């Protein structure tokens, strides 16, 4: 069965920590992005990890030249267990992050195809090549969309790597459409459906139970 990853895209530190406290028994990892980190600072990652003792992934979708990617990785992986990067910038930029991560025993997760409708314009046409590149570079995992189950399946088969898949919940992705594609090494990302709900704890529990079927 795949694991559950919470996308914690809130802006307020206290609210973020309250949600983490509420859901920590039902999520396997937490993903933080620019909204929370730009609002509160990178140390929020350390606070979250201390509170829940779960893997915390920095979803910064790093997409710069190798020298800049290296600097971003060094700052981020001081606290985070892994970092998400874009692959379209090329092998050298991804390798720069991998070099930092390897020294710190941290993870690099590479985007192949995103979950929103606009991803079909430019990312989807190159997603298969990005999946091949991810396999070649032996990144730790890839990002592929739950909103397009057929693409999730194709990308996973090409890359032969663990997948973290966004889009379940608010974006319309359904767990029942992807469960047979995923295995115990994969993560399903749920964000707004949990953190915007009246009861994040109950929603997290519900999604965890759905994954355990």
From Swiss-Prot:
Xref: SUPFAM superfamilies: Ribulose-phoshate binding barrel (SSF51366)
Superkingdom per UniProt: Archaea
Residue stretches spanning the membrane: none
InterPro entries per the UniProt record, alphabetical: Aldolase_TIM (IPR013785), OMPdecase (IPR014732), OMPdecase_arc (IPR047595), OMPdecase_AS (IPR018089), OMPdeCOase_dom (IPR001754), RibuloseP-bd_barrel (IPR011060)
Amino acids binding substrate: 9, 31, 59-68, 115, 166-176, 191-192
GO biological process: 'de novo' pyrimidine nucleobase biosynthetic process; 'de novo' UMP biosynthetic process
Active-site residues from the entry: 61
GO molecular function: orotidine-5'-phosphate decarboxylase activity
GO CC list: cytosol
Pathway field: Pyrimidine metabolism; UMP biosynthesis via de novo pathway; UMP from orotate: step 2/2
Entry's family note: Belongs to the OMP decarboxylase family. Type 1 subfamily.
Protein name: Orotidine 5'-phosphate decarboxylase
